Amino acid sequence: MHKKLPFLKVDGTRIVNEAGRPVRLKGVNLGGWLMMEGYMLFGRNIPEKAFKEQFEKALGREALEDFTRSFRDTFIREEDIRTIKSWGANCIRIPFNYRLIEFEDQPFSLNEEGLRYLNRAVDWCEKYGIYCILDMHAAPGAQNPGWHSDCYGHQELFSNEFNKDRYLRLWRFLAEQYKDSSAVAGYDVLNEPVLPFTNEAALKDLYVKATKEIRDADTKHIIFLEGNFWAQRLASLGRPEDPNTAYSIHTYAPYDFTHNFKIGLYYPGRAYSIIWNKKRFEMLAKPYRMFMEHNDVPLYMGEFGVNARDGHFGEVKWVEDMLSVFKDNGISWTYWTYKTVANYAFPDGVYRYLDNPPWVNRQGPIYGWETYASLWPREKGRMIFSWRTENFTLNKKLYAVLEKGFAEKK
């Protein structure tokens, strides 16, 4: 058991501990665990709820509950938190689906079985002396049209008062739940919101209300607010009304390179008729640095990541340059993501599953998690075992760069 972590707070453009010492958060995301995503299991990017509806239709409610419990118990375990701590990281971002803690068909209910996993993760972080950030990755009604907000392309959080009430009530509950846990660095209250630029005031209004709900229960933890348009536009947020607030941004630029959507792109190199290199990222960081200083607020890069191609296309150099820019600008960061089934596209994990059993089935035509329902009755044991990190392979080149970043004192 590690010594109890001190609470963190915001001090101008820095995050500091209770003694006033600066703490730059550096770590990884636990993507795909409490908010499942298709590509991370070598599947199509359909909403998690669509996958589960198909699974239940094929095998029934009891089998779905058995699958869900088995996956959550296995994909991330205590050993994983210990491993991340051993790397030298000091923070883990934990994305979760609101459906983890509220039954969709029972608004304002509490799913105690789901909450147990968040509690367990926080307890592990306390045990090993590493901070965590709780990230609501999918909110009631959905905050963006992406599969990763668990919707079918239509977000209905901002336009629906009932969904907003559910969202606010959930954050009030979570703040009550974790107000005394110093291992929680803070609350990332809404992942990658998307609103028309003409309606960005609606995002700030929701953030003001969420902050009030949290502060009525918890005055200690940092509140992380993400900008509009996939956590990129901060201007409309202005200076935070609550002094213990940090702003969060995400980047996967250039998108076709980091996601391997266009064959033959290199880093440094040209994409969209622009040369992408460290100098360009330094230039792109300047407005964010000015925003930090003008509004006296810290910045946190909650997500950045790249599809691994064994380093042959400059992807490791991309990560290296990103970390250098973050360091020079005092930006905290968490890499996306800790582990995935190796895929041809989308950002990979530091750990990758390289095998090709029937439930991966890279050759298709049905592959990844859409094979699960047909295989679960006879392959359950092997599938569960395959999800353990010991069966994944460490991307040593990527890990070496991240480890160096974790070790930096600044």
Model-predicted segments: where are they?
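N-terminal carbohydrate-binding accessory modules
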Residues: 1-89, 405
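Active-site region of glycoside hydrolase catalytic domains
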Residues: 3-11, 17, 127, 142-276, ...
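Aromatic- and acidic-residue-enriched segments that line the glycan-binding/catalytic groove
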Residues: 37-48, 108-113, 140-161, 240-246, ...
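Alpha-helix-centered segments that form part of catalytic cores
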Residues: 60-89, 276-287, 299, 381, ...
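Aromatic-rich peripheral "rim/lid" segments of glycoside hydrolase catalytic domains that contact
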Residues: 311-410
